[in-house]
Every structure is written in C-alpha cells, then in structure tokens.
Amino acid sequence: MRAPARGTGCCGRSGGRWLAGAAQPRCLWAGGAGQRFMVPGGTMKSLKKDSRLRITPTRLLEASENVKEKKRAKGPEQPTPTIQEEPEPVSNVLQGDDILALAIKKEDLKEQHIPRLTEKEDKRVITQKFIIRKLKPMDPRRKVCHLVARPANPDEATKPLDYSGPGDSFDGSDQILPHHILGSLQDFKRIALARGNTQLAERIPTSPCLMTLISAEGESKQKAPKEEKRPPWAPPPQHNFLKNWQRNTALRKKQQEALSEHLKKPVSELLMHTGETYRRIQEERELIDCTLPTRRDRKSWENSGFWSRLEYLGDEMTGLVMTKTKTQRGLMEPITHIRKPHSIRVETGLPAQRDASYRYTWDRSLFLIYRRKELQRIMEELDFSQQDIDGLEVVGKGWPFSAVTVEDYTVFERSQGSSSEDTAYLGTLASSSDVSMPILGPSLLFCGKPACWIRGSNPQDKRQVGIAAHLTFETLEGEKTSSELTVVNNGTVAIWYDWRRQHQPDTFQDLKKNRMQRFYFDNREGVILPGEIKTFTFFFKSLTAGVFREFWEFRTHPTLLGGAILQVNLHAVSLTQDVFEDERKVLESKLTAHEAVTVVREVLQELLMGVLTPERTPSPVDAYLTEEDLFRHRNPPLHYEHQVVQSLHQLWRQYMTLPAKAEEARPGDKEHVSPIATEKASVNAELLPRFRSPISETQVPRPENEALRESGSQKARVGTKSPQRKSIMEEILVEESPDVDSTKSPWEPDGLPLLEWNLCLEDFRKAVMVLPDENHREDALMRLNKAALELCQKPRPLQSNLLHQMCLQLWRDVIDSLVGHSMWLRSVLGLPEKETIYLNVPEEQDQKSPPIMEVKVPVGKAGKEERKGAAQEKKQLGIKDKEDKKGAKLLGKEDRPNSKKHKAKDDKKVIKSASQDRFSLEDPTPDIILSSQEPIDPLVMGKYTQSLHSEVRGLLDTLVTDLMVLADELSPIKNVEEALRLCR
C-alpha cells in the first residue's frame, strides 16, 4: 500500500522532502485500520515506540523554528556553494513487521482508557473509622454585639455613605420589592436615576398603572391578540356556578358510594341523608299547630290567639310589656313548601327514600295518624296550595336552539287509484326505512321518511301534505343559528328537484312594514343521483326580535307520493338581548336597599306603636279664635277696627232687642200676634242658620256646647264677671245650639239669651231691612253704612311715640325716688309711716264707681282694727305691686285702641281718690274706723318738709335735664314744651 499524498498525515514541508542532516520528525498519527505508512530514517521499533508519544503543536512549531535558525546560522560559515546530493530513494512499501507494529493491542487501550467497574463485579467495601470533632453551635440568643467607637484615621479619605445595604439583601431576586427599602419604590427609582445608577433603577418593577400609561403614550409594542367575543347568553367567567355544582356533585356521589359499599347500606339509609325529610316534618308540624286551637281540647289555647295574656318583663310600673306576635293577632303567614325535584335527586345520586320497615319514625305514630284524620278537613282549608314540585321544574339553556321534527301523513291509504300491492309495498318501505339496498324506481328518504313513486295517484291527494319537516330555531337578535335537512336518493332513478315557497295568510299583514329575509338556504334546483345524499343547511338570523315562519315545498320530478307535498316548515323565535344588564343590576341593588330600609322602618314603627303611649288629642282649630279672626273670615274685603265693631254691636242691641222690651211692657197681649211680628219672626228664623259659624260648626260637638253654656251660666250666677255681651266662643256655641227653635222669634220672652250679631255685615243689613219701624230702619241703615265706610278704609300703621314713653318712664322714676326718700326721712326722723288700704266695692252694671280706695291710717292703731288693717294693707299692697308691674309691661300698648287686651279691661278700673277727706266725706264706709292721730312735733315736721322740698327740686332738675337730652337726641326740631305737656 502506498503512502497518502503529500501534506496528508505528516507534518513538515508540504509537497517537499526533508533536507539532509535535519532532524526529521516522525509520524504524528496513524491511519485507520488496514493502512500502513513508511517513515523515512527510522525503524519499526522506533516507530512503534514513538507512536505512543504525544507531541503537542507548540513543540512541533518550536522544532521547526529551531531548524530554520540553524539554517540561517550556517549560511555565512559556508560561503562556497553546497553540492546538492541526491537523497536515497525511500521505499514507500510497508513490510510485515511494520504492519504488525501498527496493530492495536488491548494493553494500549487499557492505558488510554481507565476501566470502569461494572455493577455485577463484586465491590470491596473498605470501612475506616475517623474521629471528627464537632463544635457545639453557639446559642444565637446569647450572642451579644458590642459596638466600640474609636477615632477614625485622618489620613483615610472619606467615602460617601451607601444606604443600599448588602448586595444579597433582596432574597436572591433580581427585583427590588417594597419591603426591601424604606420609603416608596417610585422615590427610590427617581433618586437612582438622578444619580445615574440605571442598573439599580432597572431592578425596580414598574406598577401596572404606570405600564398602562407608558403603553398609552405611543410605544410601539405588539398588541395582544384580540380575545374571542363571548356569546351574550354565556354567564360571566367568574360565575362558574354550574361547574362548581357539577364538581361538588361528583365528589358527593363518590363519597356516598364509598360509604355505602363500606357500611353495606343503601345510599338512602346513610346518615348524611337522614335530614332530607326534616323540612317536610316541620311543615306538617306547623300546619298541625295552626289547626289545634280550633279543637275543643283547648290545647295551646292560652298562648296561641289574640285572647292570650300579655307577658310582662319586670313589674307593671317600670317593666316592659311584650306585644303579641302576628300569629297571635291572626296574621298568619302562608306555609312555604320546599322540596327537591326529581332531576335534582337523580343528579345528586339520591333515589326515592323509603324508610326501613323496622324503624319507628315520627310519621308512623298512631296518634299522629289519628290527628291527621281528625284535622284533615281543616288542614286542607289552611294549606290549600299543594304544589307539585316535579311539575314546577324548569330545565333549559340559553344557547341558540334548533330542532328538526318530521310528520308523516298517511294520506295514501285513502287513495282509490292505488293498488293493494303498492300499499303493501309502501308499508314495507315505511317499516324498513333503514334498508341499505336500493329500491327499484324513484324513491327518496326525506328527513328519514320514505317517499317513493306510486303507480296510480289520486288528484285529490295532490294538495295534501305527505311529509312535513319542521325546523325550529331560537336565538338572540343579531345571532345566527343553523339546522340541517337530509335527503337521500335510495332508488335507482335520478330525481330532479326544486324549491317553491308557499304563500300563507298572515293575520298581521298590515302591521309588517319591512320584508327582510331571515331564513337562508340553497334554494336552487338540482339533481340527486342514485345513492347520493343531499344535505340542505338552513340558517336563521334576525336583527329584530319576534316570531317568524316560512313554508317551502320540495318538488320532485318524477312526482313522488302520488303528488302529495313534501313540505318544510321553518319556525324561528328571535329574543331580545339584555343590553341593560348592568343598569338593571344597579337598579335592583338600589331597590333592594330601599326595600330593606322600608322594611326596617315599618318594623320600627310597628314596635314603637306597640310601646309608645298614644298622643294626646289635639285642641280644636277654632279654640283660640278671636273676634277679629271671625270678622275677617266673614267679611274678607273689610278691615277690622275695634271701636267701629263695638258700635255695631251696640247698634244691634239697640234695634234688635227693642221688640223684646215692648213685649215685656205688654205682658197681657201674648195671645195677640201681629202679622208684622210673624213676618219678622219668620225672617229671623231664616237668618238664624246663616248666623252660624262655618268654621266651628263641624268641630264642636253638642255635648261640649251644652257643657260650655252651662259653665257660662254658672259663672254669670256667681257674679265674678257680668259682661254686657258674651265671648266669641259662647256666641258661636249659642248660634250652633240646636235647642233654639227656628220657628220662634228671637224677640219672644222665653228666658233664652238674646241673639247676638254674628259679625257678618250682610246678615246685619238683612236683619235691618225687616225692621217694622221705618225711622228705626233708616237710622240703622245710615249708621251701618257709615260703619261700613270706616271699615273699608285700610287702617294706618300705628306709630309709637318714643319720646312720650321715655318721658313717662322718667316721670315715674322721679315719683318712685320721691316716695322712697320720703319713707327714708320718716324712718330717720321718727315720724309715723303712712298706710294705704285698698277696698273692693261691687260695681253696678252701668256705673263706673271706684272699686279700690286709698286710706291713709296712722300707725297708732289698737285692737282688732289695727290687725285687720295691717292684713288688708299687706294684701292690697301685693295686688298694687302686681298691677303696677303689669302696667309697666303694657306701657307701649296703652295708646292702641284696637288692641285685643281692651276687651277684658272694660269690666274693672282702678281709681284712686284724690284725698282722704273726699273719701271720708262723699263715700263713707262704716266698716272702717280711724283711730285718733298721735301728736307730731312741728320742728321735726318742718325739717321733714324742708328736706322733702329740696329733694323735689333736685329730682325735678334732673328730670328736666334728662328730658332735654332725650328730646335733642330723638327729635331736635320738635318743641320740648309739647313733650312736657304730654307727660303731664
């Protein structure tokens, strides 16, 4: 075998030979098996020995460099040109020993590869014992760290403080979490970026909201794939109720099956199902409790009805009373029935429960069976709504729905033209519609029903429906649903077909405005070859909600079923989408909250009504009506003036009571009644109902009228008050009194109170117009018109004279100061004090005599008169002080003639006598006996008079000064003398 080409397998000059005398390298590697190489200048043994050595490339390069340097060094030493000698011819043929030397031995392979021990070989286990010293770990709790402060080396350069902490303080994560640092991550990142530490800033995660903002700013990022639109009928993803129910139901089934196998019991007898009948038992107990009070045995009689006693918590004074429940008050709630439908029981793996025969349960009690029979009629009346739970079960889904139903009308049996053989053959086809072998002649399987050619056909059957396929669709508006109809040619003849729409009368033809197509399918004509299966796909889609129908006829040639129609009925229901679901939920939550608040409020009100004391009956509306209010109500356009209205009252009494006085003057003429008096009585009888007050007529009952009238008459008899006319309420009660006979004249002397004016000018005018005397009528009309004119004028607003009031108050202060100084002088000089005695004298009806008199009595009294006088003095002094205070409070209202307070002050007036002599001479009183005065020293009396005069001068000087100042402040232009005159 020859050596390989130059430059392959050996290192040296490519394509050349080694120079003479140079160190010739040996072969670095051997060829594969079966190749032999001849190495010049060496033997087989040296080649075998050198083949085991490894020469690195670095050593090879060093050797080549050494050869080149030797060549360069020998160049100048041999100036004479060298004679090139021809090298000896090298034989490239390998000898036998060389071939054996190139063979690979196992020993060489073992030296190159370390042998591995196999698992099958026995391993020698060498055990050695070593003693290892193990230190006891220190308790970390006892470790104490001490910090020792030492002065820093001044030569060391100060380093900036680093607050980032150790490098591995982030729990081995690449990100910096909020609990790694003090403060917020945003501030930390901002400071790191300000310092240029971007590597640290990148380790801070960005919050989702910031990522959203960054992406919204316009970063070119790849958009996420669009989520597939979920159908509107699908529930939200978080509402996986059905999945949870199915998972829990499957776990429950496995659990109860395992328990049933382990305990050797049926599923219905497991302990986990013993409470299934508890609800039914409770309902029956409640129903029996409701019917028990109707029995005569009086069971639960005391605590079950509205006649039961109230329960007290505590005593009757400070405790609480428990109100009755709704059931005790007769407001029983209907019994609620709760059951499990059959499908739920099957789904949960709970069959119909049957109690074991050896168990004596509550239902098998003989007493209960007897009670049921006894109370059966009443229980049926109370619990009349026995619902069938299985019948109330609703099973359905909100997904698009489509269904195909087929009706085969046997109209061919009535065909007169068809033979019995054809009829029998058709029945055979109908019974064996799934026969795979073809039928001779034209034949179709229309929606699974056979439709074949009939030899003889009846013309009457051509308009009859042979096979009707109903396709039903149900979906939401805007959604699409589909259904398929299959037609198979199971005959031996090709059949041509086409579609024709049938016209159906529509009741609401006028109401349909648009004729939009909603059913879609391939209605082109075509041919069905023998053995071919043709599938027609029908689609339905509607943009509006409603019920839609279409009827199509599948026509064939040749005609099948003797000319009967192969009909396809399309019926679809499009439902409205719930686009306001969110708004409805919000509204439902608001209504639920409002309902809860309303229920709580009603419950609280009901509880409070059962606990709180009922409110006191309010006073009637017209209890505080005054004469002015009644006048304004009955005369809206007029204005009330007290003096004018009083004059009208006086005019009424003057002319309306005149006939009554005339009747009293002639007591013997009672039987003779003039026609004028009769006419006047009838007119007054007509006017009497009109005088009644419309305000208080429906509010004051008759017993109260009588009680008030009796109390008024009793007060009149006592004599405490004897007013000339009654109060406003008494007038109303007298007018409303049913005791006054409408047929009697108000002037008849029956002892009844005289009819008063009802404050209505129109009634006044009518009463004046029926007066018999013309002169009286003219005079009354003239005065009435004059009063009406005065009442038509709007009253001027009252202006209070502040200067007059202040002057009067200053004058009263001067008098009080003078009296106080006089009493002080008398006490200092030892003079006797003056006493004032007030006496109440009864006042006659039309006289104004002074009811209160002032008597000055010296201190030197003796006996019973002195004690009596002192007691009367204390009593009357207290009355006087009260009246003075009352007068000071009502000072600003004294000059108001229209004030309401003047009505009660016409009865009493306080008048003081000018002097004691006038009282003793003109109106002597025998009940008072004055004792003789004690002698007074004239010198002391002179000092008293002189001091009193000087005090009067000082008080008057102060009064005049204050009056001048006030006059200048209030009205500087007004004459002060006029104010002084007014004060007098």
From Swiss-Prot:
It comes from the Eukaryota. May play a role in spermatogenesis. May be involved in synaptic processes. This is MYCBP-associated protein. Keywords: Cytoplasm, Developmental protein, Differentiation, Membrane, Phosphoprotein, Spermatogenesis. Residues 218-231, 862-910 have a biased composition (Basic and acidic residues). GO terms for biological process: cell differentiation; chemical synaptic transmission; endocytosis; spermatogenesis. Its main location: cytoplasm. The modification Phosphoserine is found at residue 619. GO terms for molecular function: clathrin binding; phospholipid binding. The modification Phosphothreonine is found at residue 613. Interacts with MYCBP.
